[in-house]
Regions:
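Short connector loops/turns at beta-strand edges and beta->alpha or beta->beta junctions
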Residues: 172, 181-184
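Conserved blade-register residue in beta-propeller folds
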Residues: 29, 176-178
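Nucleotide/phosphate-binding catalytic cleft detector across ATP-hydrolyzing
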Residues: 1-166, 183-198, 210, 218-289
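Ser/Thr-glycine-rich phosphate-binding loops at phosphate-binding pockets of nucleotides
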Residues: 169-175
Length: 289
């Protein structure tokens, strides 16, 4: 993220680029991460200050978790989350007014089919005036640049000689790309709905069936992210069993796409990398970069 902008009384001089990662688990900018959740209210929230006010409605950010929607342009949710991410990044820079270009991504195999709709969705209003955390922001949106997700994460890996496989496992999708001698292989691109939420849903269903109680994601997420440690309680053991089954399925899918442990360097990014680290033996074998 560039930092050579000049600001004067909270207003940027010249265009600035702001990167946004619209994940189903979290919204990420260069300096902020928050849960992908939004709840709409007609009146100002009583206890929460973490809200967007836009067109006379109030949207509390990050208290809930969006259900996987398939197409992010089907509702206003990701538009409001974009405003929140934009405000977070401007606030970090000490800005309240700016000309902005968004840099955003799409899953690898969906770039061609969804880019036009995604750009139109984010560009639906070029003159933005809204409030976030009770502070006013004014933005002239100059454009939206769309990139294939995942490639930027391995940009600093150097030449990447030999055979490599990039796997981006987010909350909603899993994308795969082969990179041979530093060259991405177009025909190898694939994206499918097999993100971490698939695993989370199975864990919650199993725990509900066993105990008759809905276990919220916030109690399961730390186990998926960090492993179960020394815990032996029911939640931990069910999480371990289902997460191990999920990572086995991931490895099967990678193998079906041509992955060979002794021949191909595996680069895993996204939240799914935590599961492979804690619930498979790939890391112990040194197979994951």
């Amino acid at each position: 993220m560039e930092k050579n902008y000049i600001q004067n009384n909270g207003k940027a001089k010249g265009k600035i680029y702001i990167g946004l990662d619209h994940g189903y688990g979290n919204i990420k900018t260069a300096h902020r991460v928050f849960t992908t959740g939004v709840e709409a209210y007609d009146e100002e929230p009583i206890v929460s200050t973490n809200f967007v006010k836009y067109r006379e409605k109030y949207y509390v950010i990050g208290e809930s978790h969006l259900v996987y929607q398939g197409n992010k342009t089907d509702s206003d949710d990701f538009y409001i989350l974009t405003l929140a991410g934009l405000a977070e990044e401007l606030k970090f820079r000490g800005l309240h007014e700016a000309e902005v270009v968004f840099a955003v991504g799409l899953p690898l195999a969906w770039v061609k089919s969804q880019a036009a709709d995604w750009r139109a969705y984010l560009m639906q209003e070029k003159e933005l005036s809204f409030m976030f955390q009770k502070e006013r922001y004014k933005v002239h949106l100059c454009g939206v640049e769309i990139f294939p997700q995942g490639l930027a994460a391995v940009h600093n890996q150097g030449a990447m000689p030999g055979m490599n496989m990039l796997v981006d496992i987010g909350n909603g999708t899993m994308s795969i790309l082969e990179i041979n001698d530093g060259r991405p292989i177009e025909k190898s691109i694939s994206t499918e709905v097999f993100g971490v939420h698939h695993c989370m849903e199975k864990i919650q269903k199993e725990l509900s069936k066993r105990g008759g109680v809905e276990v919220p994601e916030m109690l399961i997420e730390p186990l998926l992210r960090n492993g179960i440690g020394e815990r032996t309680d029911d939640v931990a053991m069910v999480t371990k069993r289902i997460a191990e089954s999920y990572t086995e399925e991931i490895i099967k899918k990678l193998t079906a796409r041509g992955y060979k442990e002794d021949l191909i360097h595996l680069y895993v990014i996204g939240g799914g990398g935590c599961l492979l680290r804690h619930f498979s033996d790939l890391t112990e074998k040194g197979a994951v970069k």
